[in-house]
């Protein structure tokens, strides 16, 4: 019989996929609570790039920081009313978000070139088969597996922190609140960053949630024992100006609101995802050092110009 034909040569290997920027998926994921963005980094297959995305996630402003930013822009930087003022305020907010994205990408690049070196990987995002969603099952899984899970982490830190804030606001040494004494202690550090001790203390005590930073400031300025709310931006601006706020103060508060340590829920989520105290500390220190550097530069420039 004739000899069998030679086996066909194997097909050439497919070309390697072009490396993509998987870290960008964490940028929009941090606009809701940053904890959601940290959990969303699970889709990144490369452990190195997943870690970079987790570490830089807090540089993206979560929804808890937007009320403070909008109030500051409206009170100190928008000088006209009507559609022109609204457009100017929106442009300033967009500029701050672009700044956050730029800093996030810059820090990611820095981490990739230093402590987390490696070869960029490709991102393959598989699409599941399309089918009609089961609304009831989606709601149940969302509430049980996600909403209650994140809220449980928040309560474990927020409840003790709320008790600490209440004690500091209601316990007094003589006629002075403990809250005010701590603010006076932090005054030199706050002035170095273009703020004051009350603002710096509010950010520290706002660790459970970024939404309570501004109410803590007002509570300390007014020497109240509970969180307070001022009706109207005009009244709020008058109160802040009476306590020494300037354009430099507002700019530094806006920058530090963008770049400071993540909230308690995000910090706990980072630890759960990385299982490392070292990387959790890096995730806290990276945005904090960024904010301290920017605020110190703005404050120094303001003093140099005599503003």
What are these regions (language model features)?
Residues 1, 5-8, 89-203, 281-307:
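Selected transmembrane alpha-helices and immediately adjacent juxtamembrane segments
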Residues 1-5, 10, 17, 22, ...:
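Extended, low-charge hydrophobic alpha-helical regions
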Residues 14, 39, 54-55, 61, ...:
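Residue-level signal for pocket-adjacent positions within structured domains
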Residues 16, 31-34, 47, 66, ...:
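Conserved, well-folded catalytic cores of nucleic-acid-processing
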Residues 26, 46, 60, 85-86, ...:
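Alpha-helix capping and helix-loop boundary segments enriched in small/acidic/polar residues
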Residues 31-36, 56-73, 91-104, 208-214, ...:
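Membrane-embedded alpha-helical segments of transport systems
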Residues 42-45, 59, 66-91, 265-276, ...:
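Transmembrane helix-loop junctions at the membrane interface of multipass transporters and ion channels
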Residues 83-96, 235-246:
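Interfacial loop-to-helix junctions that mark the boundaries of transmembrane helices
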């Amino acid at each position: 019989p004739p000899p069998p034909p030679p086996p066909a040569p194997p097909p050439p290997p497919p070309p390697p996929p072009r490396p993509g920027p998987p870290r960008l998926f964490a940028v929009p994921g941090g606009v809701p609570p940053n904890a959601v963005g940290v959990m969303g980094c699970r889709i990144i297959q490369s452990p190195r790039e997943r870690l970079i995305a987790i570490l830089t996630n807090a540089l993206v402003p979560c929804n808890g920081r937007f009320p403070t930013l909008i109030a500051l822009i409206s009170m100190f930087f928008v000088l006209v009313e009507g559609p022109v003022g609204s457009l100017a305020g929106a442009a300033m907010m967009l500029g701050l978000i672009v700044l956050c994205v730029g800093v996030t990408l810059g820090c990611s690049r820095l981490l990739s070139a230093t402590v987390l070196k490696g070869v960029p990987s490709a991102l393959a995002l598989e699409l599941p088969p399309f089918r009609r969603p089961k609304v009831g099952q989606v709601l149940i899984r969302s509430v049980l597996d996600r909403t209650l899970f994140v809220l449980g982490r928040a309560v474990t830190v927020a409840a003790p922190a709320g008790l600490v804030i209440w004690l500091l606001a209601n316990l007094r040494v003589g006629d002075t609140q403990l809250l005010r004494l701590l603010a006076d202690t932090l005054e030199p550090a706050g002035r170095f960053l273009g703020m004051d001790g009350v603002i710096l203390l509010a950010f520290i005590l706002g660790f459970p949630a970024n939404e309570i930073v501004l109410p803590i400031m007002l509570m300390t300025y007014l020497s109240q024992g509970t969180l307070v709310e001022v009706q109207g931006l005009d009244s709020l601006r008058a109160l802040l100006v009476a306590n020494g706020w300037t354009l430099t103060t507002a700019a530094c508060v806006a920058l530090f609101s963008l770049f400071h340590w993540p909230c308690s829920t995000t910090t706990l989520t980072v630890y759960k995802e990385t299982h490392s105290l070292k990387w959790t500390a890096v995730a806290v220190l990276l945005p904090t050092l960024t904010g301290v550097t920017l605020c110190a530069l703005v404050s120094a420039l303001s003093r140099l110009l005599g503003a």
